[in-house]
């Protein structure tokens, strides 16, 4: 059995073998990544857990804190399929509220500062998806965003720990643990890959960086802080 973390790793392993079971975690979308035709009924040697966060809850959080938001920036590496999917899903989540999503793409960490500066004066907030390039440079992004006191919301708790303002996040521990349980079932002969549908996190949790809240001077509703 092979374990794979992230979409690029899963794709590399899936291309290397069609026979050995592969259990993946932290995959945005197994179908769009061409790992299988149906997450509900895996038809390849791949299964696992996805890391799709609750974008509807993320947008609800942003609107609770910034009810007058009109333009939301998103920065991502366009070569990461998981990031492209998240950008499209964010647009869908924002559309009912008339929030325009402003996209900026980067190729490497060297592009982060310039990309962040393009948001200054143009967006009311920034959303960071589970993107490997951007996630590795959150402090650089924050240094620019804080110049204009632009709140940065992260797709996962790690972004907040790196300096972002807030996140309605899934637990990567939980989806990793569940992938481990799937792997154990396969190794023990209890199930085959095709018996195990792709799963996601059962619940999300709110994370707020209170130091960043003070830096931004944001009046966060008590109802949010009490959650």
Language-model features: locations:
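Short hydrophobic alpha-helices and adjacent helix-cap/hinge residues
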Residues: 1-227
């Amino acid at each position: 059995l092979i374990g794979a973390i992230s979409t690029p790793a899963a794709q590399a392993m899936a291309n290397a073998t069609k026979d050995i079971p592969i259990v993946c975690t932290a995959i945005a979308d197994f179908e769009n990544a061409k790992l299988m035709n149906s997450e509900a009924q895996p038809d390849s040697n791949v299964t696992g857990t996805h890391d799709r966060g609750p974008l509807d809850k993320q947008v609800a959080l942003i609107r609770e804190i910034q009810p007058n938001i009109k333009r939301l920036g998103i920065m991502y590496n366009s070569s990461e399929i998981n990031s492209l999917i998240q950008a499209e899903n964010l647009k869908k989540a924002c559309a009912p509220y008339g929030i325009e999503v402003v996209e900026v793409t980067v190729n490497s960490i060297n592009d982060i500062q310039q990309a962040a500066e393009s948001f200054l004066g143009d967006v009311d907030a920034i959303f960071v998806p589970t993107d490997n390039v951007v996630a590795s440079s959150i402090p650089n992004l924050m240094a620019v965003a804080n110049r204009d006191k632009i709140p940065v919301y992260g797709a996962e708790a790690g972004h907040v720990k790196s300096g972002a303002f807030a996140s309605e996040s899934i637990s990567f521990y939980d989806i990793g643990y569940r992938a481990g349980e799937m792997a154990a079932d396969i190794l023990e002969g209890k199930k085959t890959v095709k018996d195990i549908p792709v799963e996601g996190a059962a619940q999300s949790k709110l994370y707020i960086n209170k130091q960043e809240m003070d830096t931004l001077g944001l009046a966060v509703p008590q109802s949010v802080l009490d959650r």
